[in-house]
Amino acid sequence: MNRRPLALLSMLALMQGCNPVDETQPDALVEDPATVEQKVAVSGFAELHHHMFAEEAFSGGWFHGSHTGTMVSCDGGAPESDHARVRMDLSNMLNLCPNSGALDLSGVPVLNSMFGVGGAVASEFIGKIEGTEGDTGLHLGRKQVNTQWPRWDTIAHQQAFEGSLRQAHLGGLSIVTVSLVSNGFLCSALPYQNLKRPCDEMTDVEVQIQMAKDFDARTAWAEIALSPAHARQIIASGKLAMVLSIEVSKLFGTKDWRSELNRFYNLGVRSIQPVHQLDNRFGGAALHNAIFQAAQFLENCHIDTDCGVTGPGFTLGFDVDANCRNVKGLTAEGKALVQELMAKGMLIDLAHMSERTVEDTVALTRGNTYYPVYISHGHFREVMSPDLAANEKTTPASVIRYVRQSGGIFGLRTAHDETRDYTRTPIANSCQGSTRSFAQAYEFGRQGLKVPMAFGADLNGFIQQTRPRFGSYGACSAGFKAEADAQAAQQRVSGPPRLGTDFDQYGLAHVGLLPDLLRDLKQLGANTTGLEGSSETFLRMWERAQSTRTGMADAAADIDTSGVATYVPKATREAQYPQICGKAYAPSSKVLGDTCRFNEECVSAKCTSLDCGNITGSCICDGDNDCGAQQYCGWGLNTGTCQNKKAKGALCSNNNECLSNNCRWTYTCG
């Protein structure tokens, strides 16, 4: 099947680099800035995709921890845990499709684990992404709040606590789009005893709306915004403006969508994602995760062989073309929905749309004098690693051009992923998955795509966040272990230094650390002016949706996608490191107390590991030179640990134990 022009244009733009395809309409007018009413700019930055009330998503059966009250430690997934696990008998779900017996999921680890094993084992697999320990299934080492969770790799524990949101607000957050979320398939995979009610995405949304209203009523520093003017008033009074949005696959269920849209508008919703993880009555979804391909398969039992997205030679559930793109665009209902959203002056979020659905939506909004669209959370395709860039869900420069032309904004995912080097920035991409990687995408967006950006963190979104640059909790770990160790060691030497907050070792663990990510980005050398003022940009987009428009907001003729370095595969990079017992390692990358596998990894050249590194140990001192000037390397019960030298009169056995370097015959320091 042939892809439509938008998809072809995006690929051509990628190949042409600094000469992207010009999609400007010949007769399109660009608005004169002088004709646009200029208001006093609000202060602060925006977060465009925040799941504050996701504890009630999936019928309340997945997350531990409330957005309000006191944060408490969890049971660590010990049976029968009330969170972070799927059922044991998920293989029965496949029986819904008579052709499921022909499926070979052995080459799709996440699905093989999920449907073949289930329970705690599958839950742990879902939560363990390379470079992490995970916090799902049996997670006894991730029980304690504040020390073991939340962390950057948390996907089943609260990251949107109201105290954390208050912390973010005090740090400069002035607008947050609260995404009311659920997913029926994930709900159906959870243990029945953990569900508070029958699985229904829109019911979950209504529960979360009520939670948002309750939060608004009892909170002096935050308020739900119902219009851009209202948001300006809220921010001017020193409060956080919250904008309600909906993100579900079964939008409005099977009910009359017009009456439902009116009802949810009256409940305070002002932003809509027409599609989410699955195709629905309104349009096609972008493919990206095998779990949701399985979910789509369970709805239609379709196995596509035009392209192998799910596994070798096959794609589950979605009808794809030879380029692995969903062929479904906006349906007749979807086109009518977009028209109604524009009539109401609501915000249209393109996130998760298939490329064809984006194309169809753009055609409608362009025809309405460039009605603004935005992407609440996304990745810039051209700067991501090849595996991620291959996902339809990533955003190509051709779509960014239209976001700019429409006067929209892009919510940049604060992701844990590898990025390619962007050579137009002096910020070294020397800590994969950390702020340094985020900086490559941000600078590409700022300098190359020149698109207005805000944060699109997706906290509580079943997804991981920016990794730390320091500490032992997955610093720089988006690549492979040896590289992570080498890069983490480099951060200690080359800096910039730690911020002195939890962000240093836990990464973007919760919403309260967004200001710290911004600070770290700034101290790395990025120009963060636009990001720091992104709330004003968001409000101008919203105002544009409700104002008379005369043409494009921006011709966007200056996009430059060049400057992105060629990606070097992990296997090629790993081959540059020495090996012991067949395992690559970074020489002298570990300091005292760090976890290690081999002596050669430690600066002290001494590691307590066993069995060729299969049983890890710790780096210990092997002599006084490994310790500080006022310390010595201990012996006996203190073997391998640096001890403070002793004052005069203290018991000693050797001269090196004494500050005076003199242990007398009385076994006391002189």
Outline where the language-model segments fall.
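C-terminal motif of bacterial Sec signal peptides marking the signal peptidase cleavage site
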Residues: 15-17
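Secreted, cysteine-rich disulfide-bonded mini-domains of extracellular proteins
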Residues: 582-670
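Bacterial N-terminal signal peptides that target proteins for export
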Residues: 1-7
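Bacterial signal peptide processing site
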Residues: 19-21
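N-terminal hydrophobic targeting/anchoring segments and the immediately downstream early-domain regions
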Residues: 29-327, 332-339, 343, 358, ...
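Short secondary-structure subsegments characteristic of cysteine-rich extracellular domains
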Residues: 11-12, 201
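A short glycine-rich, hydrophobically flanked beta-strand micro-motif that places a catalytic Asp/Glu
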Residues: 353-354
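Short catalytic-loop micro-motif centered on adjacent basic/acidic residues
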Residues: 347-350
